[in-house]
């Protein structure tokens, strides 16, 4: 456990933001709440490259009170509100270099019934197939802003991770009129996972959900899609 977390922290400290985004696919994201532990596998993530990225909040080294966490150390949780939805990001570069990864979707695993309750009864792929949806499902709130994704109640659990068969790189969603930054393939997804939004139904891997065929990786997938535990 300690070894795996050290490796994860090292990735955040030494790799590019694009590499960290891809590394996070298959990573287990867990939130310990007062009513139990909720968690799942990250399947969709977008890289934001800071001062040069016209779609990034920190474009041009913009600094506001809301952006303070983006300038903190790797692994810092950056939360912001968009259209009433709270969005989860993680800082991926050294302090003072404001780059990060937005988590767009997870495949829910633990505490699914509570996630459904948190989402007012929504279930199946609609439970966590968007950035605001997964934050609501996991019960994430603004109190986590500025805390560490390695050691807070919301944390990465590398010893539980899975590995994608294939990673696809796509343009980010909802980035209009930003020149080349609109089309750059900075969104990374687990190809074939049903919790990926805006994909053809025929592209979904109904057997393995896009994961490599390793021990225990096929267990109990179908019941989650049906929204049952």
From Swiss-Prot:
The cross-references to Pfam families, in alphabetical order and at most eight, read: Pur_DNA_glyco (PF02245)
Top-rank EC class of the record's enzyme: hydrolase
- Report the EC code(s) recorded for this entry: 3.2.2.-
Q: Which domain of life is it from?
A: Bacteria
Q: Which UniProt keywords apply?
A: DNA damage, DNA repair, Hydrolase
- Which GO terms are recorded in the biological process aspect for this UniProt protein? base-excision repair
Covalent S-S links between cysteines: none
Among Gene3D superfamilies, the record links this protein to: Methylpurine-DNA glycosylase (MPG)
Which GO terms fall under molecular function for this chain's record? Answer: alkylbase DNA N-glycosylase activity; DNA binding
The record's comment on protein family reads:
Belongs to the DNA glycosylase MPG family.
What HAMAP family does the entry give? 3MGH (MF_00527)
Q: Which NCBIfam families match?
A: 3mg
Name of the protein described by the UniProt record: Putative 3-methyladenine DNA glycosylase
């Amino acid at each position: 456990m300690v070894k795996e977390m050290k490796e994860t922290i090292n990735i955040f400290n030494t790799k590019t933001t694009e590499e960290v985004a891809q590394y996070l696919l298959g990573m287990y994201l867990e939130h310990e709440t007062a009513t139990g532990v909720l968690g799942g596998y990250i399947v969709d993530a977008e890289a934001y490259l800071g001062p040069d990225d016209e779609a990034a909040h920190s474009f041009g080294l913009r600094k506001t009170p809301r952006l303070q966490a983006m300038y903190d150390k790797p692994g810092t949780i950056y939360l912001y509100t968009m259209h009433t939805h709270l969005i989860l990001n993680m800082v991926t570069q050294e302090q003072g270099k404001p780059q990060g990864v937005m988590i767009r979707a997870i495949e829910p695993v633990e505490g699914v019934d509570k996630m459904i309750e948190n989402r007012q009864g929504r279930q199946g792929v609609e439970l966590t197939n968007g950035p605001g949806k997964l934050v609501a499902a996991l019960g994430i709130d603004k109190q986590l802003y500025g805390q560490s994704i390695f050691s807070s109640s919301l944390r990465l659990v590398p010893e539980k991770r899975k590995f994608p068969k294939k990673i696809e790189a796509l343009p980010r969603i909802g980035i209009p009129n930003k020149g080349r930054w609109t089309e750059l393939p900075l969104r990374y997804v687990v190809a074939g996972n049903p919790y990926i939004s805006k994909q053809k139904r025929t592209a979904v891997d109904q057997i393995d959900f896009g994961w490599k065929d390793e021990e225990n990786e096929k267990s109990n997938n179908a019941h989650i899609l049906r929204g049952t535990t």
